[in-house]
Amino acid sequence: ILHVAPEQAFFKFLKSVNNKNYITFDLNSPLADIKGDICAMPFEDNFFDFILCNHVLEHIVDDTKAMKELYRVLKRKGIAILQVPINVGRDKTFEDNNITTKKERIEKFGQYDHVREYGLDYYTKLESIGFSVEKNNYASKFIENDINKFGIVRDEIIPICKKN
């Protein structure tokens, strides 16, 4: 398992159940076993069975290169969860490299450290890299009370990416 930019809650759980085969990777995180750039990862081709990469790619200037790296290190028949915030009202991803100030980025991308706002074309982009993508509406599996209790985003689609 490769966990890019490990979140504390997932980190604790995955470390406790899969300590020997769980590798964390990030540019700066103190939780990272290996520090490095997602656009040039120090792993062999076809190394990981599973990759978890939540809310990372919207921060990466060359997201295509990062996606290609994730594809490269994923084993054939491996699975990658490559979640990003998606504006479902936008068909095409919006990015503009001239938007550089924190204020402008908050206005245009929703957060000061985002470099784009993904649209519905995100899934097609993943497919263009080579992944097959299953769009999983996981929230539909929960009852209304649990959606509110756990803070689940009702219409969020989780891309389950596979390398064939």
Regions found by a protein language model. Give the residues of each.
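Charge-rich, low-complexity linker and terminal segments
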Residues: 104-107, 125-128, 147-148
